[in-house]
């Protein structure tokens, strides 16, 4: 059995609401200032197939709760609520239409933007296609060039292989020659070892000879006077420039003096020109500083028919009847070149070229 369900909607309205309702009903707003609470019934649609008569009865029962208020008051309160619902629906419809219009505008703008973007992308794709075509053509040309180069490289490789084969053959020939050279080298090394041993033996002999030579030089040093290694004179001889001079302490005739100088591997000294400020003059003063006045020495200049020096130089002069030989004579402090009988006995001066110290 279906039971009747009563819905009661109770709303507590504050003072401002009461004043607004009273103003609408044309009542005094201060009529309800006694603190009474006003109950308002709201019209609701039927729920779950409840008939409108039942809803009306429910509302009627709710209206009976406040028996003190008249029926006119109830109707006046109910009518404005229903009037407020209708403008709300109209406003919602307007907002809905406005939203639909804005949505359509957005869709239109979106479609335009998509179209423009489509055109841009299409142009970019066309440009990309042209670039790809150019690139493809370039790649084809490069590919053909690479194929040509590979063919050339293959030919070069074949040529290199042939050259490698020839080089290998030449290398084998060189290896055989190298082996032969190694054999010769080993033989040379054996000879070198023998030569080295011989050289060591010769070196030992050379050292022994050098030692003997050093000992001999030490023994010979007292017999030689050396200004340097290339200018040496026998002991007792006087060195002047690159010549050695020997002044005898004994007297002999000219011929014996010449022979005595020859036994000493020398010859009689020659002084071609003797005059003050001449080289020979100064040399005689340095050679015979202690020579007193009247001292004479045989020299190599003899006066036969022709004045012939012992060094084979010629000087033509008138000769005397008897054989005369040259001598150097000191008178006081002057040296002169004079003639003397070759048989006279005088000291003599021998001259020889300075020599290198014996190695």
Curated annotation (Swiss-Prot):
Sites of Phosphotyrosine modification:
7, 39
Q: Which GO terms describe its molecular function?
A: carbohydrate binding; signaling receptor binding; transmembrane signaling receptor activity
Q: Which GO terms describe its cellular component?
A: plasma membrane
Q: Name one GO biological process term.
A: negative regulation of B cell receptor signaling pathway
C-type lectin domain: from which residue to which, for each copy?
A: 232-352
Look up the domain of life of the source.
Answer: Eukaryota
In which tissues does this protein get expressed? Pre-B-cells and B-cells but not terminally differentiated plasma cells.
Report the transmembrane regions from the record. Answer: 96-116
Chief subcellular location equals: membrane
Listed as disulfide-bonded, the cysteine pairs are 233-244, 261-350, 325-342
Q: Which residues lie on this side of the membrane: Cytoplasmic?
A: 1-95
Q: Which residues lie on this side of the membrane: Extracellular?
A: 117-359
SMART domains hit by this protein: CLECT
Cite the post-translational modification comment.
Phosphorylated upon engagement of the B-cell receptor, probably by LYN or SYK. Phosphorylation at Tyr-7 is important for interaction with PTPN6/SHP-1.
Residues glycosylated per entry: 136
Q: What does this protein do?
A: Co-receptor of B cell receptor (BCR) that plays both positive and negative roles on B-cell functions. Recognizes the Sm/ribonucleoprotein (RNP) self-antigen ligand, and coligation of CD72 and BCR inhibits BCR signaling. Mechanistically, ligand binding leads to the recruitment of PTPN6/SHP-1 to the BCR complex which is inhibitory to BCR signaling. Also acts as a ligand for CD5 and thereby plays a critical role in maintaining regulatory T and B-cell homeostasis.
Quaternary data: Homodimer; disulfide-linked. Associates with CD5. Interacts (tyrosine phosphorylated) with PTPN6/SHP-1.
User: Could you identify this protein by its name?
Assistant: B-cell differentiation antigen CD72
């Amino acid at each position: 059995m279906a039971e009747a369900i009563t819905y009661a909607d109770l709303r507590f309205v504050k003072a401002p609401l009461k004043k607004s309702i009273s103003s609408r009903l044309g009542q005094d707003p201060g009529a309800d200032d006694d603190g009474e609470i006003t109950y308002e019934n709201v019209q609701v649609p039927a729920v779950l197939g409840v008939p409108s008569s039942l809803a009306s009865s429910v509302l009627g029962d709710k209206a009976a709760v406040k028996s003190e208020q008249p029926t006119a008051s109830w109707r006046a309160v109910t009518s404005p609520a229903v009037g407020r619902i209708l403008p709300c629906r109209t406003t919602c419809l307007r907002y809905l239409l406005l939203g639909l219009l804005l949505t359509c505008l957005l869709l239109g703008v979106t479609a335009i933007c998509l179209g423009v973007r489509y055109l841009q992308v299409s142009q970019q794709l066309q440009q990309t296609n042209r670039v790809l075509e150019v690139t493809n053509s370039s790649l084809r040309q490069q590919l053909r060039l690479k194929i040509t180069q590979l063919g050339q490289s293959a030919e070069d490789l074949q040529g290199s292989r042939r050259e490698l084969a020839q080089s290998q053959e030449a290398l084998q020939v060189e290896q055989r020659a190298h082996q032969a050279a190694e054999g010769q080298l080993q033989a040379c090394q054996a000879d070198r070892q023998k030569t080295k041993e011989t050289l060591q033996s010769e070196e030992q002999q050379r050292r022994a000879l050098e030692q003997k030579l050093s000992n001999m030089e030490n023994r010979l040093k007292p017999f030689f006077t050396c200004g340097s290694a290339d200018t040496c004179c026998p002991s007792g001889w006087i060195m002047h420039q690159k010549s050695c001079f020997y002044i005898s302490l004994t007297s002999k005739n000219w011929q014996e003096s010449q022979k005595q100088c020859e036994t000493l591997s020398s010859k009689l000294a020659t002084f071609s020109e003797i005059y003050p400020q001449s080289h020979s003059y100064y040399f005689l003063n340095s050679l015979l500083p202690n020579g007193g006045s009247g001292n004479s020495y045989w020299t190599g200049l003899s006066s036969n028919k022709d004045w012939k020096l012992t060094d084979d130089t010629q000087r033509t002069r008138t000769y005397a009847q008897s054989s005369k030989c040259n001598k150097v004579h000191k008178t006081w402090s002057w040296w002169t070149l004079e003639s003397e009988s070759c048989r006279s006995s005088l000291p003599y001066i021998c001259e020889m070229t300075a020599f290198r110290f014996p190695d």
